[in-house]
Amino acid sequence: TPGHAVQFEKGKYKGRIYIAANHSAGDPQKESMDYKAHGFYTDDHGKTFHISNNVNLEGGNENMATEISKGRLMLNLRNQQGHTKARYTALSSDGGVSWHNQQFDNNLPDPVCQGSLLTIGKSRGKNVLAFCNAADTSQRNHLTLRISRDDGKNWKKSILVYSNNDKQD
């Protein structure tokens, strides 16, 4: 999975390093249903690693992780099946071991493409998140940066970075 690792800054899992990952198992399946999103984590600076549970989305891959408030972790992933043209999110309250509140975020349209998620600061006790992707449901277009000040519940700030409406490129 392209992306970055996250080191927890507070809470019970402070210091834990979490690396978002994905895998496929067995023979390739129709619509990439063999893809699964998960992660690896270490509590001893890389001497040993453990693998998390899979996110409950067949075809989930290219996920990104970031710490949100109360020491929780958010995964934001690509839906390789493409049946829902939006990003999929999952939350963890146990340091990235297991997942809850798993759902499509229809406020984050996606054409089945890698996206990026980072924590870029803090505001009123919550992490400020930045999410960037091709915010289009049919093609890799409309590169958009979105900002959330409430742990990714809402993305009120949206900046169109680039749009190619010329179909010849």
Task: Name each model feature, range by range.
Residues 1-169:
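Asp-box/BNR beta-propeller blade signature and adjacent active/binding-site loops
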